[in-house]
Swiss-Prot record:
GO molecular function: antiporter activity; ATP binding; chloride:proton antiporter activity; PDZ domain binding; voltage-gated chloride channel activity
SMART domains (UniProt xref): CBS
Name of the protein described by the UniProt record: H(+)/Cl(-) exchange transporter 3
Glycosylation sites: N177, N451, N479
Binding site residues for chloride: S239, F527, Y630
Motif extent (Di-leucine internalization motif): 28-29, 46-47, 71-75
Species the sequence originates in: Cavia porcellus
């Protein structure tokens, strides 16, 4: 059926007008940045385009072909495999959209024939909602499982619950009647490793034994994680978001979203988080959700046979991933729209919203943290913010931008060094070394020993009457006779100053270790470490402003709104703003990030501080480089990804960029009726191009169409097996009518059915600024360059990327995938 759809792929599109009459606007193709084949050298994968407007370029339709006639000369039966894609190749967005339109028309035309056809039509219409529902259910369930397992294994580094081995520390002490307010985390049921092994709960011996066991478990978890990744699913490492962006732009990476990757990523994500490495599970949860979406899409023919439609499901899945990662369904939809998706029609927006809703509902039903919230660090603030506080909020934004710029440069430099040195050949050793250093340094400091999510929770939490943290060790010089929600600002006690020093050390530790951790061969997210760094900085700034307001409340900046005994400053709010600023500085997200953090806090009142800090961090970060961390890793890995956010302002023409250039060999082309099967097979074997222009003759150079290498190979192999008389000397005919041949000639092979009759073309005088825009908007892989209808050359996406690198004074070879 797929091949049959391919035959109707839109070769009836005899003019631009036939495209503009498509069934819906989105089908006109807001294409994605389609990627080139990694393994080909020059004329890479080709994509037929549909539209061309403007004065400098034109849309051709196969030279002198009579476009009013039936353009297809179908073979006796469909050719299996034509229209499918190899690994590390780019999908043909236009062909996939045409296949879907043809499928839709065929179903609509048959649905009135019988009740069965009507049922099939309804099933087809609802399959999109069904697949995103299944994706949301699976994403929510897996996220709950990962949260519960990671919490239990994190606490396993410190001790074990004897009454119920599957309880973490907090759950173990829930049912105990022997806990005190000051030591609420201590109960007889929970035993540290020192108590179990040497029978001591206190003292130097106990500390050393707990230290050793902490390092042992951290190294064990890290070693198991990297070993599973290396042996079973190499694609399970890293964040996954750069590759998800690349896949959503049209690239195919077989196995990246497969069942083995899903299984290993889920298991190793728990191990990596529990090992105490400076990483988070939020980014990899997007990869896990996309794996679920990809697997479920194979249950529905509408998506399993159409790569463009499948990417709509993956966009919805990425929204579900962020929804369960942060408990932010709306933020997840905006994240998918702003950060990862390239092609995002309106119906995908609705389905993304629904997938995020279902995933959040499932996670809420599981209640992994026991607090009836979707995340561990949900907080609510009751104190309003004041205009003066915008100044420290903006300073936090500047810090976030500087941190983001530093992190991107340092991490990319380290990852590049890893690729270019022998160190990168020993991923297991690297993970063990990083885990060992992290564990040895982290244990003595209570803030780095904490699970990062718990650290963020503690930094976000406002100091209330029931808080026993050292961050809330203020001197009570007020005669408070009753417990109230809003405790007035007080002078900091010894515990607060001690905590600030520990937080400063934790900040330095987190900054250094995150640079070296992101990119190692275990699942590693960046959201939580970045938020932790910002939250530490924000809490420190918040305490400083709070003490300034307490001791100098008569200053004019405090005098109007901060009275003695009032609760003016909320340090936890500063931590939240700092977390958003640092995450924005690294990823360069804006709208989606503000909404995610707003959904975390449940307070509309703090949107303005968040917006101010996030925008400031983006501006400061952009001053050092416009790329976020994910775009930087895409460029580092050499994925030919044409970023829609980049601007092209140079005044070159298509003729300056096209190949062949001067001193290059001539362009490899096919003629419409002068070549034999052997000629074509020799050309395929001698070149590595992914397709060949078809011209009328070598003399005229008039363009007829374009034939893909894969389609030619499959069609010739199929013809040799199924059609009698096809031999090496058989004439291959791409023309509408077979030319007259001598009687003794072997049977000709008619391949007009695999010919793209409307390849996208531009003239040699088209400005490159327009060509780049066309590639982005239509998701093209290449276009042909003509002059008065005569073929001159070809421009591929790799040519554009090389040209953009040269104009930016970069080495083109350094950005292309090897």
């Amino acid at each position: 059926m797929e091949s049959e759809q391919l035959f109707h792929r839109g070769y009836y599109r005899n003019s631009y007008n036939s495209i503009t009459s498509a069934s819906s606007d989105e089908e006109l193709l807001d294409g994605a940045g389609v990627i080139m084949d990694f393994q080909t050298s020059e004329d890479d994968n080709l994509l037929d385009g549909d539209t061309a407007v403007g004065t400098h370029y034109t849309m051709t339709n196969g030279g002198s072909i009579n476009s009013s006639t039936h353009l297809l000369d179908l073979l006796d039966e469909p050719i299996p495999g034509v229209g499918t894609y190899d690994d590390f190749h780019t999908i043909d967005w236009v062909r996939e959209k045409c296949k879907d339109r043809e499928r839709h028309r065929r179903i609509n035309s048959k649905k009135k024939e019988s009740a069965w056809e009507m049922t099939k039509s309804l099933y087809d219409a609802w399959s999109g909602w069904l697949v995103v529902t299944l994706t949301g259910l699976a994403s929510g369930a897996l996220a709950g499982l990962i949260d519960i397992a990671a919490d239990w294994m994190t606490d396993l580094k410190e001790g074990i619950c004897l009454s119920a081995l599957w309880y973490n520390h907090e759950q173990c002490c829930w049912g105990s009647n022997e806990t005190t307010f000051e030591e609420r985390d201590k109960c007889p049921q929970w035993k540290t490793w020192a108590e179990l092994i040497i029978g001591q709960a206190e003292g130097p011996g106990s500390y050393i034994m707990n230290y050793i066991m902490y390092i042992f478990w951290a190294l064990s978890f890290a070693f198991l994680a990297v070993s599973l990744v290396k042996v079973f699913a190499p694609y399970a490492c890293g964040s996954g978001i750069p590759e998800i962006k690349t896949i959503l732009s049209g690239f195919i990476i077989r196995g990246y979203l497969g069942k083995w990757t899903l299984m290993i990523k889920t298991i190793t994500l728990v191990l990596a988080v529990a090992s105490g490495l400076s990483l988070g599970k939020e980014g990899p949860l997007v990869h896990v959700a996309c794996c679920c979406g990809n697997i479920f899409s194979y249950l529905f023919p509408k998506y399993s046979t159409n790569e463009a439609k499948k990417r709509e499901v993956l966009s919805a899945a990425s929204a579900a991933g962020v929804s369960v990662a942060f408990g932010a369904p709306i933020g997840g939809v905006l994240f998918s729209l702003e950060e990862v998706s390239y092609y995002f029609p309106l119906k995908t927006l609705w389905r993304s919203f629904f997938a995020a809703l279902v995933a959040a509902f499932v996670l809420r039903s599981i209640n992994p943290f026991g607090n009836s919230r979707l995340v561990l660090f949900y907080v609510e603030y009751h104190t309003p913010w004041y205009l003066f506080e915008l100044f420290p909020f903006i300073l936090l934004g500047v810090f976030g931008g500087l941190w983001g710029a530093f992190f991107i440069r340092a991490n990319i430099a380290w990852c590049r060094r890893r690729k270019s040195t022998k160190f990168g050949k020993y991923p297991v050793l690297e993970v063990i070394i990083v885990a060992a250093i992290t564990a040895v340094i982290a244990f003595p400091n209570p803030y780095t020993r904490l699970n990062t999510s718990e650290l963020i929770k503690e930094l976000f939490t406002d100091c209330g009457p029931l808080e026993s943290s050292s961050l809330c060790d203020y001197r009570n010089d007020m005669n408070a006779s009753k417990i109230v929600d809003d405790i007035p600002d007080r002078p900091a006690g010894v515990g607060v100053y001690s905590a600030i020093w520990q937080l400063c050390l934790a900040l330095i530790f987190k900054i250094i270790m995150t640079v070296f951790t992101f990119g190692i061969k275990v699942p590693s997210g960046l959201f939580i470490p970045s938020m932790a760094i910002g939250a530490i900085a924000g809490r420190i700034v918040g305490i400083a402003v709070e003490q300034l307001a307490y001791f100098h409340h008569d200053w004019f900046i405090f005098k109007e709104w901060c009275e003695v005994g009032a609760d003016c400053i909320t340090p936890g709010l500063y931590a939240m703003v700092g977390a958003a600023a640092c995450l924005g500085g690294v990823t360069r997200m804006t709208v989606s990030l503000v909404v995610i953090v707003f959904e975390l806090t449940g307070g509309l009142e703090y949107i303005v501080p968040l917006m101010a800090a996030v925008m400031t961090s983006k501006w400061v970060g952009d001053a050092f480089g416009r790329e976020g961390i994910y775009e930087a890793h895409i460029r580092l890995n050499g994925y030919p990804f044409l970023d829609a956010k980049e601007e092209f302002t140079h005044t070159t023409l298509a003729a300056d960029v096209m190949r062949p250039r001067r001193n290059d060999p001539p362009l490899a082309v096919l003629t419409q009726d002068n070549m034999t099967v052997d000629d074509i097979e020799n050309m395929i074997n001698e070149t590595s191009y992914n397709g060949f222009p078809v011209i009328m003759s070598k003399e005229s150079q008039r363009l007829v169409g374009f034939a893909l290498r894969r389609d030619l190979t499959i069609a010739i192999e199929s013809a040799r097996k199924k059609q009698e008389g096809i031999v090496g000397s058989s004439r291959v005919c791409f023309a509408q009518h077979t030319p007259s041949l001598p009687a003794e000639s072997p049977r000709p092979l008619k391949l007009r059915s695999i010919l793209d009759m409307s390849p996208f073309t531009v003239t040699d005088h088209t400005p490159m600024e327009i060509v780049v825009d066309i590639f982005r908007k239509l998701g093209l892989r290449q276009c042909l360059v003509t002059h008065n209808g005569r073929l001159l050359g070809i421009i591929t996406k790799k040519d554009i990327l090389r040209h953009m690198a040269q104009t930016a004074n970069q080495d083109p070879a350094s950005i292309m995938f090897n």
